[in-house]
């Protein structure tokens, strides 16, 4: 069943659309939102506002939106690990980092084979706890990334 909130550009997708799903806009004050990660234990969602170099937080209990972290190293993709910590791909930091429960940032990976990462973009945490991420070169050329040349 097609709902007015969704525009299906390919009729074949209709079989995947659930009739009981609706869209809800949570916030409009970002320039470019990406990388949502949900924390079920805390009932909140975080996402990146990449050009504004901040992570935003939406509280499911009261609907409020606040800044979760700033600066955020122009973080992009996120995931939550098995211990409930935020894993993030940082364009400016050229690394994959983790925000600890006390708020401190730990760099998990910033190089491979002796070369700096380019522009980590998306990340998932596998059920065994291993972290998989993409590292394309295109983000390194954007204005808000590290000024260091591509490795």
Where do the model's predicted regions map?
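Blade/loop signatures of beta-propeller domains
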Residues: 1-21
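Beta-rich, blade/repeat-based domains predominating
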Residues: 22, 28-43, 71-90, 95, ...
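A short beta-strand motif characteristic of beta-propeller blades
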Residues: 23-27, 64-68, 106-112
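Short loop/turn segments immediately following the C-termini of beta-strands
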Residues: 50, 91, 136
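Structural signal for beta-propeller blades
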Residues: 53-55, 94-96, 141
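Short loop/turn segments that connect beta-strands within beta-propeller blades
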Residues: 59-62, 100-103
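A generic, well-ordered mixed alpha/beta core segment in the N-terminal half of proteins
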Residues: 95-98, 104-110
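Conserved small/polar residues in nucleotide/adenosyl-binding loops
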Residues: 144-151
